[in-house]
């Protein structure tokens, strides 16, 4: 994910992100890891999504990442902005946090590179982009998980 975040090329970032998703999916399907999983290690993490025009898009991205890793998301509006609560196994939450942070940085970088003729048009484009990006991420994770399951012994 570090390589994906470090590049300015969106195609290269996408390739690195797909590879990271593939590696995570492959290691999640390891039967030894599933047997050793301690069901008492459930937790809830709080992730601030802030305020503004892109909160729902950020929530959509976080949900796509969390659901791909068997975690669930709920959110609340607070006086300081929107807060998401992600529930799942601690090891899954660690992955969700890293993946979401990296993917959000990549999306922000790609969104900031585009300007439309007006501020409102730019905002609409960026909002649409973020929802589409979240959908593409969800599809990528699902494809990686399916491939890892097919390759598992």
Residue ranges and their predicted role:
Residues 6-8:
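Short coil turns that connect the paired helices of HEAT/ARM alpha-solenoid repeats
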Residues 10-12, 25:
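…; additionally, a secondary subgroup of soluble metalloenzymes is captured
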Residues 12-19:
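Short, charged, amphipathic alpha-helical segments
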Residues 25-153:
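Long, charge-patterned amphipathic interaction tracts in eukaryotic proteins
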